[in-house]
Each structure stands twice: as structure tokens, then as C-alpha cells.
Amino acid sequence: DGDFGAITFGLMNPNYLQHQSERLQQSIINHLAMITTIKGVCSDLPEFYHNAINLVDTTDINYMGVSLGGNRGPSMLSLIPAIDRGVLWVGGSSFSLQVERSTQYTQFEELFASPLAYESTLDRSILISLMQSMWDTTEAETYLPFIDGGMDGELHPYEILYIISMNDAQVTTLSADRASRTSGIPVLSNSTYHPYGLDVTEAPVSGSAIVYFDGEFPAVPSGNIQGPMEYHSLAHNQVLGYDPAVDLA
């Protein structure tokens, strides 16, 4: 569908990553169109009725995002007025902070660091930071400061619950810390980890919050590097099937 090609060429020439950025912007439009359509004409179709009961509940629409969906949740919730509550699994903010710390980056680094692209680690780090401006239109960091009051009727207020897994090798826990501080949401008192600078609140809570689960998975590197691939699906994926986390969501 063009995404892989856009990223491949972008690793050799970051100007091409604009195409990937545009696809992220299009995804918000696609979600808006989907929600509007399902709430509207689709919900009235005979196929969505059973025993004269409409099977589509259009009164309460919420968002649940996992991984990239967790990263992009704040932009969706802020820009689409039909949804104002979301659960964001293993997400965070600042894609340029996440990239080099992610095992997902491993598959791209071989080309990015090749003689066809940028052999210098320093050059690659600088370019990733510069690329952030291309991602800002759908970046959580752009929308999290307006979580409570919105902005001028263009950005809408919303509530979120971040569910984070310690030692996540795909989406670094550091980016969840950053997202929570940017938004000013509290951390639940029974969370296994309390990020610096956050208010601590007791559950149940009315409004937004963040909670961290610790499955005692292997520690990821503390530096600006990704962990080994055998860590790839541990903390990131297994929290999704952990009953207390699912119940909380």
C-alpha cells in the first residue's frame, strides 16, 4: 500500500518521509469518516437490526488504541468530536524519542546505517530529531496539553487511561512518562511505578490517569538504543492479556 516503500526511500533521503507523514494525517480523516458513517447511514441499514432492535449503539463511542494506536490516540480524541474517552495501551509521546529505543527500529537501521544512507550514528540521531516536525501533526505531544479544556473549539477535551508495561521493548516507558507529564494526568496509587512529577491518585478515578504494570520482564537498555529482538513481544504484548489490566480498561 506504499507505506513500506515510503519509509524505505525515507531512510535514504528523509525528505521522502513526508509521504509517510501524510498517511498518518489521512488516518485521522479515515477514522472521522468511519465514525460518522457508522453513526449515521450505516446504523440505519436493515442488516444492523435484529428483532427491531438496532445493534449499533451510537450513544457512547469510545476509543481504544494499542501501540501505534496508543501513540496516536490523543490526536484522534482531540480532533474527532464524536469520541471523548479512550484507553491507550502501551503508548506514549514523541516519536523521535521512541524510535532508536524500539526493537521495531532494528529492521530499518540496517538500511539507515548503510553506505546508501547515513553511516554516522550522530547523523542518524540528528535526522530523527529533525523528522519530528513531519510527525507533529499527528503526534500526541501536540494535543496532550489541551486534554482538559481543548482549544478554541478546534481541539476538543477528552479523557484517557494509559496502560503501560514496564520494560516495553517496542514503545519505551520513558515516552509514557513524558506523555503523562505533558498532559498533567495523575498516576494511580496502585501502579507499580510512579513517574517523577506526577500527582498520585486513588482508584477509582473520575477523569484521566496512567497506570504501569510490571511483569518482571528483562530490563531494556538504559541508553538511547534498542533492546535485543527476543524482548520484542514480551512486555509490549503480554500486558494485553493480563486480566487486571483488561478489567481496568
Name what the model sees in each region.
Residues 1-41, 46-48:
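Cap/lid segment of the alpha/beta-hydrolase catalytic domain
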Residues 28, 32-35, 39, 61-62, ...:
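Generic hydrophobic alpha-helical scaffold/packing signal
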Residues 37, 43-100:
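Primarily recognizes the serine-hydrolase "nucleophile elbow" in alpha/beta-hydrolase
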Residues 13-15, 53, 60, 106:
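A signal for specific C-terminal beta-sheet/loop modules enriched in small/flexible residues
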Residues 30, 69-72, 175:
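General structural feature for long, well-ordered alpha-helical segments within catalytic domains
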Residues 15, 19-26, 82-249:
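C-terminal subdomain of alpha/beta-hydrolase-fold enzymes, centered on the catalytic histidine
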Residues 1, 60-68, 141-149:
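Amphipathic repeat-derived elements
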